[in-house]
Amino acid sequence: MSATGPGIVVIDKPAGMTSHDVVGRCRRIFATRRVGHAGTLDPMATGVLVIGIERATKILGLLTAAPKSYAATIRLGQTTSTEDAEGQVLQSVPAKHLTIEAIDAAMERLRGEIRQVPSSVSAIKVGGRRAYRLARQGRSVQLEARPIRIDRFELLAARRRDQLIDIDVEIDCSSGTYIRALARDLGDALGVGGHVTALRRTRVGRFELDQARSLDDLAERPALSLSLDEACLLMFARRDLTAAEASAAANGRSLPAVGIDGVYAACDADGRVIALLRDEGSRTRSVAVLRPATMHPG
């Protein structure tokens, strides 16, 4: 077991590594197999990758569903096979005629509640197989549109490159948003095609880039960014339990509801998070028991 105990590490993922590669490095650094991540980043992408160590892997599913923020560069005028710079160029259409006003107007139509067809090279399963594996085999992949929310899609800068235009953008979005698909849809809306040439994730829920550490720094000075208790109390509202309630929660039993919206952290008298709960009607439902009654005290 890791000597550091359970908790969260916020990594600034470098380009060229898969999210699974980062998990592998963290397993070696923390000397434990119980390591996972909250939300895949493509190999070309950099930025915030939240890693769970030991029992903190139990909360990663909740983090995966958290809103996210990105900084990206989109190239208008080219369509690629992967919707990013790693794929083959399938089509080039002159984009030099596009004005900033036209680009921003197209971006405006992609803000708010929309339906998005995920990237064909996403990790979504189609017939039990990952879409990206099928796409790379040259097979047609049909994915259903999904509801997402784009809270911010802001144009920061534009650079003209012969017949192409590169734009720098920042995006705040719901979980399940594919930035490659957003670039594709923007290019399609403008009639010239588009793909992502650079992508950096700057936020996952309450975890931001200024909290992130490089893997090299982590290897030199292994330490959690936050303990499991600290991470839970940062992410969720708090409910203090009596001793009897704490015992019940540790055994997975329901408690009387208290009217807190969403998932919340239920703490014992020492401030330790016993479980994550959700009110459903007049009772609670256990989302995750983090300190089960069978666990050694601590």
UniProtKB/Swiss-Prot annotation:
<dbReference type="GO" id="GO:0006400">
    <property type="term" value="P:tRNA modification"/>
</dbReference>
<dbReference type="Pfam" id="PF09142">
    <property type="entry name" value="TruB_C"/>
</dbReference>
<dbReference type="InterPro" id="IPR036974">
    <property type="entry name" value="PUA_sf"/>
</dbReference>
<dbReference type="Pfam" id="PF01509">
    <property type="entry name" value="TruB_N"/>
</dbReference>
<dbReference type="GO" id="GO:0160148">
    <property type="term" value="F:tRNA pseudouridine(55) synthase activity"/>
</dbReference>
<dbReference type="InterPro" id="IPR014780">
    <property type="entry name" value="tRNA_psdUridine_synth_TruB"/>
</dbReference>
<keyword id="KW-0413">Isomerase</keyword>
<dbReference type="GO" id="GO:0031119">
    <property type="term" value="P:tRNA pseudouridine synthesis"/>
</dbReference>
<dbReference type="InterPro" id="IPR032819">
    <property type="entry name" value="TruB_C"/>
</dbReference>
<dbReference type="GO" id="GO:1990481">
    <property type="term" value="P:mRNA pseudouridine synthesis"/>
</dbReference>
<keyword id="KW-0819">tRNA processing</keyword>
<dbReference type="InterPro" id="IPR020103">
    <property type="entry name" value="PsdUridine_synth_cat_dom_sf"/>
</dbReference>
<dbReference type="Pfam" id="PF16198">
    <property type="entry name" value="TruB_C_2"/>
</dbReference>
<protein>
    <recommendedName>
        <fullName>tRNA pseudouridine synthase B</fullName>
        <ecNumber>5.4.99.25</ecNumber>
    </recommendedName>
</protein>
<dbReference type="GO" id="GO:0009982">
    <property type="term" value="F:pseudouridine synthase activity"/>
</dbReference>
<dbReference type="GO" id="GO:0009274">
    <property type="term" value="C:peptidoglycan-based cell wall"/>
</dbReference>
<comment type="function">
    <text>Responsible for synthesis of pseudouridine from uracil-55 in the psi GC loop of transfer RNAs.</text>
</comment>
<dbReference type="InterPro" id="IPR015225">
    <property type="entry name" value="tRNA_psdUridine_synth_fam2_C"/>
</dbReference>
<feature type="active site" description="Nucleophile">
    <location>
        <position position="42"/>
    </location>
</feature>
<dbReference type="InterPro" id="IPR002501">
    <property type="entry name" value="PsdUridine_synth_N"/>
</dbReference>
<dbReference type="InterPro" id="IPR015947">
    <property type="entry name" value="PUA-like_sf"/>
</dbReference>
<dbReference type="GO" id="GO:0003723">
    <property type="term" value="F:RNA binding"/>
</dbReference>
<comment type="similarity">
    <text>Belongs to the pseudouridine synthase TruB family. Type 1 subfamily.</text>
</comment>
